[in-house]
A protein has these predicted regions:
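Helix-loop-helix hairpins and the membrane-proximal interhelical loops
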Residues: 1-47, 160-162, 196-286, 429-431
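Helix-loop-helix junctions within the multi-pass membrane cores of secondary transporters/permeases
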Residues: 1-34, 55, 75-85, 89-134, ...
């Protein structure tokens, strides 16, 4: 496998394959979870199952050959929830238009990937605020997960209240969440998918959550125009996404993908010292970011929300993966999932939504690295995190976070800590509020 430069990276074929299998087990949960979440927009579940598997194959394989890094890519958790509940359902925007917004944001990101923009972002946006955004998205998707599970529910007096714990549906969801947390806590590989499958089998046996055993496990991929991939492939509406009212949504997709990809890719690279090479390190990072943006644009065309680098790639890196062969093995494994449509369709909803909560917990753990001793960071981080679930809007939380950061720095006259990046993002945030006021 000379193409992947295994000898130069001091890797063996066996090590890379094991690393790829490890990453696959850690992230295969995305197929049932993403299709279940985005299916709330009205897109056919069968089409989404096929699209999720297909774009994971294409994006991961593209990164394998283009960047030669062990970073697998798929539909991003958090942004798929934002796409569904905040954009399509919350603002009554057609999924075709939302896909158009994803495509536009991805093209902008791809164009900027050819410049030094990403390095400018790393230098100018405080790391603490980037961590707060990650933690905020974690709160947001955990809130959505608990809501969909029925653990919390709307209350006209208190806005939110506890759900009906007499409901078998709610109790089954709590059991699944506890099972996933248990598998994760004991560091079991593939904890998420094992938790989903184990609880699904229990649901099938006891007919919980209206579940029953799938009639068959395997089938040919569904590419039909009725409820298969053909129903969502190339259905994005770019024209309607260019409407001025879509600007905040496009900016949200762009900024979140930017911070998410930079954080994930550099984090994965740090685990394996992948980008430390003074000669090729920055080139590899640049190519991986380009692959990330390309995958997202292709994802919108295929019918999925934002595609991004998966943090689960760290499991493969920790297993010894250092080259694109790891990502290629992930792509090959996902190719087999194209034939498991009946199995994924039979998984009950409350065996899936607990994954949202667990992913939210992992994302929220980033707060441990935030410097709360700095008053500007503390105030901005608080608003960034808390306003996401409170307003059902990632855009609004960005605005509160960046503006409050700038204001506290001004109040304290810490002019040396105010840079062009903060000023630009604060002006964009102010513009977002003005757009909201004019609507």
């Amino acid at each position: 496998m000379s193409f992947f430069k295994l000898k130069e990276n001091n890797r063996s074929f066996k090590t890379e394959v094991i690393a790829g299998l490890t990453t696959f087990l850690a992230m295969v949960y995305i197929i049932p979870v993403n299709s279940s979440i985005v299916g709330n927009t009205g897109m056919p579940i069968e089409a989404l199952i096929t699209a999720t598997a297909l774009i994971t194959i294409v994006a991961s394989a593209f990164n394998a050959f283009f960047a030669n890094t062990p970073v697998a890519m798929s539909v991003g958790m958090g942004l798929n929830a934002y796409f569904t509940f905040a954009v399509c359902l919350g603002q009554n925007i057609a999924w075709q238009s939302a896909l158009g917004a994803v495509f536009i944001s991805s093209i902008i990101f791809l164009i900027l990937s050819f410049t030094h923009f990403r390095l400018w972002v790393i230098r100018n946006i405080p790391k603490d605020l980037r961590l707060a955004i990650c933690a905020g998205i974690g709160c947001f998707i955990a809130f959505l997960g608990l809501s969909q599970m029925g653990v919390i529910m709307h209350n006209k007096d208190t806005l939110v209240s506890i759900g009906n714990f007499k409901s078998p549906h709610v109790l089954f969801g709590i059991f699944t969440l506890a099972l996933i947390i248990f598998f994760w806590a004991i560091k079991l590989r593939g904890a998420f998918i094992l938790g989903v499958l184990a609880s699904s089998i229990i649901a099938w046996i006891f007919h919980l959550d209206n579940a029953s055993f799938p009639v068959q496990i395997f089938s040919w991929p569904n590419f039909s125009m009725e409820n298969g991939l053909g129903a969502i492939f190339l259905q994005l509406d770019i024209k309607s996404a260019l409407n001025i009212t879509m600007i905040p949504i496009i900016l949200t997709f762009f900024i979140t993908q930017l911070f998410d990809s930079i954080g994930t890719i550099t984090g994965v690279g740090e685990r394996g010292k992948i980008f430390d090479d003074p000669k090729n390190g920055e080139k590899k990072l640049s190519k991986t970011l380009m692959a990330d943006a390309t995958g997202s644009a292709l994802g919108a065309m295929t019918g999925t929300s934002t595609v991004t680098a998966f943090v689960e790639s760290t499991t493969g890196v920790e297993s010894g993966g250092r080259t694109g062969l790891t990502a290629l093995v992930v792509a090959i494994c996902f190719a087999f999932t194209l034939f498991l449509l009946p199995l994924f369709k039979a998984i009950p909803a409350n065996a899936i939504y607990p994954v949202l909560v667990m992913v939210g917990i992992l994302m929220f753990m980033e707060v441990k690295n935030i410097d709360f001793k700095d008053s500007a960071i503390a105030v901005a981080s608080f608003f960034t995190i808390i306003m996401m679930p409170f307003t059902y809007s990632i855009t609004t939380s960005f605005a509160f976070g960046f503006l409050s950061y700038l204001l506290v720095r001004i109040f304290k006259r810490e002019w040396d800590k105010i840079n062009l990046g903060i000023i630009v993002l604060s002006l964009l945030s102010l513009g977002n509020f003005l757009l909201m006021a004019l609507q």
